[in-house]
Amino acid sequence: GVKKEGATIGIRLSHAGAQTSESACGEQPVGPSVLNFGRDFDISREFDQGDVEEIVLNFVHAAERAEEVGMDFVEINGTEQQLLDQCCCIKLNNRDDEYGTAKIENRVQLALDVVNSIKKRESVKIPLSYYFSIFDKIDDGFKPKDLKKMLTLLENAGVDIFHPLAIHAMNKCFENKEPLCHWSAKYTDKPMIINGNIKSPQLLEEAATLGCADWFAMDQSIFDRLQWYQFLKRKIDK
């Protein structure tokens, strides 16, 4: 399978938060606030402390299962407007408690709870990655200092790997100065996964010149070509 081809494989763990419906999950969706993502989704209720405990425990159990089936690492989804991303977004989170307000340390608190609990579980020994993006938050005032604070908090909680999301790996942010992966590498020494429309040796080499990637993630790119990784490796080794 994947490992025989020389690749590393991990599994991403997500909680949809308000971006689901009662028919899909069996109960009213929960989110950081009362939200409605559209006609295909139900209006969420604001999560309470009991919900937090259940959410965290579900992430821990999912990480345990990832370890059991032989994953090389497990990744927490903090982007794609899933629950942890909803908490981080000012437009979607209007709480005034420890999981809200304008402070980034409050908006990332649920993610910290998840990471802390997974790292404390002795049955989970594989590395923990955190998947995040900030492009949709910049217009709402998300600054480099917020990125630095967020990464520092997550690193202190136990994140082993960071995985910044960009539509294209080379897309620049914060006044169009540098790609997100480059900004992230300024604020953490943890290994970095880069992805974002990397579908050719040329694009991979361009991304590699940034000098901040330890791994390059391939997802949809490999579906059409099962030998895609070996093809790419041969091209680069030439």
Report each predicted region and the residues it spans.
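Flavin-dependent oxidoreductase catalytic cores
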Residues: 1-238
